[in-house]
Design a protein with these regions (language model features):
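Short, conserved sequence motifs used for protein processing/export or organelle targeting and
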Residues: 1-198
Length: 198
């Protein structure tokens, strides 16, 4: 579909492409997903029939970190200021990074569809795309919270980021998503999401 003008909308930012290559989602065949980037049977990729089985035990684990997001959006210059605060809830060994992303909902663009029960086939020209990754504010792999090999309970990492929104990003439909992960195995400890306009 890359050369098909019907699918001109590009939903593949640099970070998304890098993650797809590293974790192997497209290579395994869609649909699939990652759950906290946990590896199951030496694979990050988990198929829909296993999502609940993998996610339910993870939801029962105590939080290792908390993330607080505070946004300030300037309508006049289309600029977001977001403060990300990560507070660790226990002593943990490892080096950790934080990634800050922008996602967008309510984007109407063509989507391939083989199921007439959910929409027109073979292409749904008015499909509503949600949770579309628009990009990151601190690179594809984020920034180190700690490189000492350990973080202590109640240790806090805080940083403020700025970004000017392109005209195609609709602030009322966008969210800031932040997550902290273990750099060695890429597993996510905690994530948070709030609207850009809150």
């Amino acid at each position: 579909f890359e050369n098909n003008p019907v699918f001109a909308a590009n939903f593949t930012p640099e970070a998304g492409n890098e993650w797809d290559t590293y974790f192997g989602n497209s290579a395994k065949g869609n649909p699939n997903g990652l759950i906290d980037r946990a590896q199951i049977n030496d694979s990050y990729v988990i198929f829909p029939q296993s999502w609940a089985e993998v996610a339910d035990p993870l939801l029962m684990e105590p939080a290792e970190a908390l993330i607080t997001i505070n946004n300030d959006f300037s309508i006049s210059n289309n600029t977001l200021t977001t403060n990300i605060k990560t507070e660790f809830q226990q002593d943990i060994e490892g080096s950790f990074k934080v990634i800050v992303c922008i996602t967008q909902d309510n984007i109407i663009a063509p989507q391939k569809n083989n199921d007439p029960e959910i929409g027109p086939t073979p292409i749904d020209s008015t499909y509503v795309h949600n949770h579309v990754l628009r990009g990151t504010l601190n690179g594809s792999w984020g920034e180190y919270v700690s490189t000492t090999g350990t973080v202590a309970m109640n240790e806090v990492y805080e940083k403020t980021y700025y970004i000017e929104f392109p005209a195609s990003w609709i602030p009322k439909d966008c969210h800031v998503v932040a997550f902290v992960y273990n750099e060695s195995n890429k597993q996510v400890l905690q994530a948070e999401e709030i609207p850009v306009l809150n």
